Amino acid sequence: DVYKRQGMDVVRVNSAHVTEDGATHIVETVHRVNPAIPIMIDTKGPEIRVTTIADEYGNSINFRVGDRVAVRGSDGSDMTTRKVVYMNVPTIVRDIPVGARMLIADGELEIRVVEKTDEELICEFVVGGAMRSRKSVNVPAVSIDLPSVTEKDRRFIEWAVKNDVDFIAHSFVRSAKDIKAVQEILDAHGSKIKIISKIENQEGLDNIDEIIEASYGIMVARGDLGVELPAEAIPNTQRRIVEKCICAKRPVIIATQMLYSMVKSPRPTRAEVSDVASAIYERVDAVMLSDETAMGDYPVESVETMARVAREIERDETHFKPMIDMDMVSVNHEITAQLARSAVRASTNLPIKYVVLDTKTGRTGRYLAAFRGRKTVMAVCYQLHAQRILALSYGVVPILRNQELHDKYHFLVDALEFLDQYRKLKGEDLLAIVGGSFGPDGGASYVEIANVDNIRRRNEEIVAAQKC
């Protein structure tokens, strides 16, 4: 609850570092404190790792530049030695060509393939150091045949369905095929969980358009991505992904080391503040903390700092102009998207206080977010899941209304009374209202602009006429 008051919108749980029982405890605790807080679970994803170091070497094996080793595939049972480095992918030798670079432990060690046989790769150390058990391996620019969903991922996805989770952040997504594999599991259980694809490797970048199309949202996970790409390439890569996501009406999250020094320090570095600010200037939907809140000494201060930076940057009205003229994917063929654009345009040209909408699924709220309007979108949700998923959308404040209404005028008046509990309204306040047809087809069907007094007066006239 302290995190929520400081500005947290979503709780993320990384399945790579927690058991199912531990994750269940986290979810139950969060929803006991506040049922409206969404939960995102990260899958571990398909990874290449060095196997366990043989006991005779202790905790690590030291290699120097120029040392040669054989690399072989394994089911994980073989132990790595000074002569043979085993990796947990049985077919790895088949997929990696001579000349390929292999980065171990986030690039702390690097080997290059100089020879290849049917059974092994002969590799030479380009960057030496201490190799430890279970360290990650990246192979830039090489496509390796890995499963879309590991057995552990499958168990956690099924756990997520049973435990009222809202988002699955799938790790190391390489193509739309990986997302479809997760979606098939969700569909088999009739789940509404939304998939966030984590972009962490070159293959994911190469297929970014199809990944965006197949996903609910995107996370730019700069840690592993920074291993495969040169550091100087990350800012432009991040910016291009953000632009593509906004055009496709997909929420986009920036993650990894945003306030990393706050793991040990109560204050961030100036460079970290600038990093957070840059992401906000790019108009991302969310910025994310990892180690800062998972294992840091100053978790509450980290959340408060990030929220404070975001509020300060968003005061810059000269930069944060609505994106109503952008060429957005499919917008010309979707009534909801056109009405959302009209509402944001009106809120730009008129002294509108809030954009107000009612939504069952959250789709209209997501479309309004895509146009990046300056005015807060107050989304009246009739389902808890819709309220939770809209917490990840730009500029949207989702609030839950348990009672669903069935006509336009009752919705307007009821929404005003309900919103007045959250944001005090004045009679002269002008609102842009985006509503649905209240019929079986769903979706937005009208935009109305009116002040609070006129809406209330009109409703009184309708009620009086109904009594006659």
Predicted region positions:
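Short, small-residue-biased leader/transition segments that mark boundaries at the very start
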Residues: V2-Y3
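Long, charged amphipathic helices and adjacent flexible linkers at domain junctions
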Residues: K180, I196, T305-A343, E460-K467
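Beta-strand/loop-dominated core regions that host nucleotide or nucleotide-derived cofactor-binding catalytic loops
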Residues: E28, G45, V50-I157, V397-L400, ...
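C-terminal helical cap(s) of enzyme catalytic domains, especially alpha/beta-barrels
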Residues: I26-V30, T293-E314, S445-A450
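Glycine-rich phosphate-binding active-site loops on the catalytic face of alpha/beta enzymes
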Residues: D9-E20, A169-F172, I218-L229, V276-P299
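Structural preference for beta-strand elements that scaffold enzyme active sites
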Residues: V10-R12, A36-M40, R68, E120-I122, ...
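Conserved alpha/beta-domain cores
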Residues: D145-T256, M262-V273, I280
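Nucleotide-binding motor/catalytic cores of P-loop/tubulin-like NTPases across gene-expression machines
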Residues: T364-R366, R372-F411
